[in-house]
């Protein structure tokens, strides 16, 4: 699986490129997963449906939907459910800056993503993909990752040795 932010869509050139990459990924038994956040979920869904490649999928990042396009992640999950092959367990919180509000990344469970509902919806839609902890900008990297890992264990069964 290859995941990427592809920038704002629709873009005719990006449509052609994603079609080619999706088809190539499918031939090798994989996916090219577009990460959510550059656009509303409905725009991404239409883009993927327009391409119609079996190798094109979604890497669903709930924090990106909140921080980048001000969208409810649960609504995004339901719209994109047929295409999600991976999720990011990432959270964000709103902070005030000089003239506006912005979001910063925080350890999972310390922000605005309602993970109780998030994981219930993933279960309801039959999600069988990967859940990845993504870390971009924690203030304390080791503590933030440790918190996120411990938090994720509440929702994701771990393999016994």
Write out the residue ranges for each language-model feature.
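Short, histidine-centered active-site or binding-site loop motifs used for metal coordination
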Residues: 5-8, 131, 135-137
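Conserved, mostly hydrophobic/aromatic
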Residues: 32, 61, 87, 122, ...
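Alpha-helical scaffolding segments of alpha/beta enzyme cores, especially the outer helices
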Residues: 13-23, 27, 42-50, 75, ...
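Active-site acidic/histidine proton-transfer and metal-coordination neighborhood
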Residues: 1-58, 67
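A short, structure-level motif marking secondary-structure boundaries and short turns
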Residues: 5-8, 61, 102-105
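Gly/Pro-rich active-site loop or hairpin
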Residues: 64-128, 136-142
